[in-house]
A protein has these predicted regions:
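Active-site-adjacent "gating/activation" loops or surface patches in catalytic cores
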Residues: 130-169, 257, 262-264
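A ubiquitous short alpha-helical element
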Residues: 41-51, 145-151, 171-177
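Catalytic cores of large soluble enzymes that bind and process phosphate-bearing ligands
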Residues: 7, 11, 70-73, 154, ...
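Alpha-helix N-cap/helix-start motif at coil-to-helix transitions, marked by capping-box chemistry
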Residues: 50-54, 153-156, 183
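A conserved hydrophobic secondary-structure block that centers on an alpha-helix together
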Residues: 58, 62-81, 169-204, 212-218
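Active-site-proximal, well-structured secondary-structure segments within enzyme catalytic domains
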Residues: 55, 84-87, 94, 98-140, ...
Length: 267
């Protein structure tokens, strides 16, 4: 987020297609792949150490996953998909960064700053002055500012504003809305997965990791889901007890979680 300057964004837009094209040229270089394949196919006769075998397998699979075994026509299709994906993913990130910089919470009453760290308050005052709002405080939903507000702000309405501002990032129907980017990325990822012999992009993404299959990964997640939810419910119950005991007078909501988690932890 700290690098989200117009200059850095312009540089990323210039370099992204170059980096993508270079990567494709490496992974779809037939002469280079054939050398890797020769070592891979004859690993048993070459006296490779376990580490060398592992490295050979790793690079062989990486090249295959990036289109080394595709026909020339399919490689051209994959290159086109990769180029479009790179542009869309960069647009997605730029939209998020632009939203973080331009969608913010303005505070004009110092009483609402209770509980916030001085560094956060000072930074918000400077940002407000930079935006022509001297005497006020501007809080963006950047990670450091957002967490400071959600964790420390005694003003519940400020926590709620910050939470909702963050949750609406790049999803407000304006020029930075990422809905179209997301839909286009999903379609292209599916095309890429099928081109490389996978049923879905999830299957493609999970293939090189320990779980190996989408079902295995889903089963793993579901196995920890119930105990995780139970633990969170217990934590929220403790927070609610603390809130009730200190006269909060409301039910704990998402924007209250970090604040009361810190209060309970400090007891």
């Amino acid at each position: 987020e700290s690098d989200a300057t117009p200059e850095m964004q312009a540089l990323a837009e210039k370099l992204s297609p170059m980096i993508t094209a270079h990567s494709d040229e490496v992974y779809m270089n037939l002469a280079l792949f054939n050398r890797i394949k020769a070592v891979h196919d004859n690993a048993g006769q070459l006296g490779l150490t376990p580490v060398q075998r592992r490295l050979t397998e790793k690079y062989y699979k990486r090249f295959v996953r990036n289109g080394a075994l595709l026909s020339a026509a399919d490689q051209d299709t994959l290159k086109s998909i990769n180029t479009r994906l790179a542009a869309l993913q960069l647009s997605f990130v730029n939209n998020v960064m632009s939203e973080i910089a331009n969608n913010y919470v303005v505070v004009d009453n110092a009483d609402r700053l209770s509980g916030l760290p001085k560094t956060t308050i000072d930074a918000a005052a400077k940002l407000a002055a930079d935006k022509g709002m001297a005497g006020k405080w501007v809080f963006t939903p950047s990670a450091s500012t957002r967490l400071a507000v959600l964790t420390s702000a005694d003003d519940r309405s400020l926590r709620e504003e910050m939470y909702k501002t963050y949750m609406a990032t790049a999803n407000r129907g304006n020029e930075f809305d990422n809905s179209k980017n997301i839909n286009a990325i999903l379609k292209l990822r599916q095309q890429k997965a099928k081109l490389l012999g996978f049923k879905t992009f999830a299957d493609y993404a999970i293939d090189p990791v320990m779980a190996k299959t989408v079902d295995a990964a889903e089963n793993l997640l579901l196995s920890i889901w119930k105990p995780a939810v139970k633990k969170v419910d217990e934590e929220v119950a403790d927070m609610q007890k603390y809130a009730d005991a200190h006269g909060a007078g409301y039910k704990i909501e998402a924007w209250d979680y970090y604040y009361f988690a810190e209060k309970v932890k400090a007891e």
